[in-house]
Amino acid sequence: MKRPFSIVALLLLGFNAAAAAEATLLECIAVVESGQNRKAVGKAGERGMYQVGKAAWDDANERLKREGHHHFQWSKWRDATAQDMIAAAHLRTIRENFKRIGKPDPSPEQLALVWNVGWSGAVSRRFAPNDYAERVGNLFRSQKVLTR
């Protein structure tokens, strides 16, 4: 698997073992979502290699603003750093939601499930992984990555 995660994004996020694991998970999501195609456009208008929709992009952008990071307009979706920063912010929001319900260490499959079907969809499935989530989880575990 190639390593397309932006060096700029890693520097902005602070490179450590946890950030490396997050970057690896996001790369696995990108493989399953688009084959790591940064120019990909989904059937429902999702954009980039992580296939982020407009609403998730806007939510992630708000998070970046709150955290004091640069934010990225939807029109900049083709920019590699924008895609990586938005994806990382979206993943932090997903993790935060798990912590809020008392699950501080969700599995890669649970994180991928929420990425794929949204929080409400994942809750309605009781976080049981679908094929997409299992593919992401298997790919993640096949990578040599330092975990938390």
Predicted regions and their residues:
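N-terminal, post-signal-peptide region of Sec/Tat-exported proteins
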Residues: 41-67
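Short, low-complexity, polybasic intrinsically disordered segments
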Residues: 115, 123-143
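Hydrophobic h-region of N-terminal signal peptides that target proteins for export
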Residues: 10-18
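Extracytoplasmic and endomembrane cell-envelope/extracellular-matrix remodeling and assembly machinery
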Residues: 18, 22, 141-148
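Short, functionally critical alpha-helical segments immediately adjacent to catalytic or ligand/cofactor-binding
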Residues: 22-37, 52, 87-88, 111-119
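Alpha-helical segment that forms one wall of the substrate-binding/catalytic cleft
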Residues: 58-122, 137
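Solvent-exposed, acidic/flexible segments
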Residues: 22-23, 42-50, 76-84, 104-108, ...
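Sec-dependent signal peptide recognition
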Residues: 2-10
